[in-house]
From Swiss-Prot:
This is Allophycocyanin subunit alpha-B. Coiled coil: none annotated. The lineage of its organism: Bacteria, Bacillati, Cyanobacteriota, Cyanophyceae, Synechococcales. SUPFAM superfamilies: Globin-like (SSF46458). It comes from the Bacteria. It is found in: Cellular thylakoid membrane. The gene is apcD.
Amino acid sequence: MSVVSQVILQADDQLRYPTSGELKGIQAFLTTGAQRIRIAETLAENEKKIVDQAQKQLFKKHPEYRAPGGNAYGQRQYNQCLRDYGWYLRLVTYGVLAGNKEPIETTGLIGVKEMYNSLNVPVPGMVDAVTVLKDAALGLLSAEDANETAPYFDYIIQFMS
């Protein structure tokens, strides 16, 4: 939920107008809109490149994942890993656009550790996967945009750790 929606819902729940501080928060959110859109466009337009670079780094670090018996062994499992990379990149993009981490949590993180555990996917490997995805994505952004984006990746990494 965006900052604007949060302020409106909170004020409405309390039967009041938004406070001056809340309105300043909305103003700050709106002034960063162009940056958030620029980041989202860069991530979306470069998804394939980011995912490709990240998977190369992960499987270089953990070649056992692609070996027989590994979680990314075989084309089907490998494609599922790449699909998950794209999914996590989209989650970060949703957070950046909303200006907060709520879309990441509500759209994608509830139950994710349990799901991976039930599928015998090593959660530390997924943490490594999101870490290399972060590195690949931030490498395409300016320093300012990378600083804005990094906390969304960090939130996922911390949640899964």
